[in-house]
């Protein structure tokens, strides 16, 4: 949402918005001349011509009520993203249950390094351009494409990427079959679709097949491999990103780059010097090693723990903040299986987002079902207990999509 607000502001529009409390993003918006109100009130609308609401906002929101009362046009974030994207000649949209932000960033860094000057919308703060928005020329728009509430169907991609499909957002989709149908529609709307075959380590379209062979661990959780396209050897890739799953993300980024005729040397250079995104395996402290990541789905948590175990023999402590009661309840057994890979777990009160309390999907219930687990009702209590448990022989993974980055900030000092 903030990236769209910034783009509209830079186009000369008066933009205001509201959030519950100040964050790094809201402070940045204010520094760019955007008015930010803290708390949701009818008076915040003032003389707005239209209102943009994200997926977490419901009809009971006082600003939505006021907009309806005054007949002000209400658009979803997805609708606005679709409108903005259509101003560009080419649209690259990256979808999937996991890896969207990192893969979008890989594509963006490659295209920028190759001098393509894209406009980029990303679901995190890029370490390459220090924002979630980069404004370029009107030829190329690179964005994440989220499936929640069929949001990505507002886009008409020139090139789409489908990284993976999982049982996610079932509070909206209800069944996995509906999730798959939504992705099928997204693929149909795309002129070219890049998909993954993770068993064969290939990213492919109808005309291209990019394969990673001779994958090897280079140390510190990073990987290298030989890249091929349509069975022709391209060269070596040395990937500056932790985790074997990022090999698959990079194959998709390479495939997209080749579609747009980017030379392989530019691709390999960009991936060698890949900067990444904040809260994506972000190391916030070296001693002890503390890592912050957006992982909030069992598959992502599992990858984080296993990737870390690949390069350290330290005890693994996980601090995890569940994101929504419905996700935790629906995937409870998967969460338990993933978290049991850690040596010790600290579960922090659920980030409920748009939902009402449900004990069966709560952080407390999740914690009660785990051994070597501690439940915390606040970030401060979590920090004190974890700090007490650290001896210098542990690696701490701070995971979640809510405000658990506040805990990471406590350890970064």
Model-derived regions, located:
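NAD(P)-binding Rossmann-fold cofactor-contacting core
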Residues: 11-28
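Structural beta-sheet core signal
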Residues: 17, 120, 160, 195, ...
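Short acidic low-complexity segments
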Residues: 35-47, 378-386
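Beta-strand->loop->alpha-helix junctions that form or flank phosphate-binding loops
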Residues: 19, 37-40, 75-82, 121-123, ...
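A glycine-rich beta-strand to alpha-helix segment
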Residues: 48, 381-413
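Nucleotide phosphate-binding/pyrophosphate-handling subdomain across enzymes
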Residues: 4-7, 11, 88, 219-221, ...
